[in-house]
C-alpha cells in the first residue's frame, strides 16, 4: 500500500492516497495497488459506515478511530479517478455503496440552510496542517467536489435516480455556498463566524464550482494580495492550489 514515510507513522491515509494515486497514474502505473487501497478502506469502515481517516496494516488490518470530514469524502473522488484511469467497472460497482455512504453521512453535517456546520472539534476536517485555519468553507467545497464525482459514478453504472438526487442536492448546496461564503465587497470567500480569508477556502470553493473559471482565476490572483489571508502550509494543500 501507499503509506507515510519512516519518519512519520507509516499508516495509509485516505487524503494522501488520493494524491499518491494521481501521481502513480502519471509514473509507475501500479494501479492494482491503488485498487487494493480503495478496497481496504471500503472493507474497514467505522461503525457508522464512514471511511476512516487512516488504516493500520500491522499486526492486522484495522481502521483507526480517527475520521475527518474531507478525507472520507475524498474516497469518492479517488474512486472516480481510479475508474477514469483504468475503466475498471467491476471495482466501480463494488465500491459505489461505500462512496454513496460518504455523501449521505456528510449531508448529516449540513444545516437547513444548505451549509456545512462549523465545528470547533480539533481534527474534524483536515484541509491543511493549520490550527488557525477555519475550515467551514473548505469543508463545503470538498463536499461539492465529492458530490460531482458521485454524480459521475452513479451515471456511469446506471444509478440514474441516485445521480439525479445527488445532483439536485449539489445545486442547492452550491447556491447556498455562494450566498453564505462569498463576500461581494471583498470579492473573496470567507469562512466561519470570524469571516476568515484563506487560500484553502478559495481553492475548495473553486474546485466545488461555486464560481466559474474566470471568476476562480480572478479570486486566486486577488487572495494573493491579501496580507491577512491564511496561507497554505503543506504540499498536500498546495496540490489542490
Task: Tell what function each PLM region has.
Residues 9-241:
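Active-site core of glycosidic bond-cleaving carbohydrate-active enzymes
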Residues 4-6:
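Leucine-rich, amphipathic alpha-helical/linker segments
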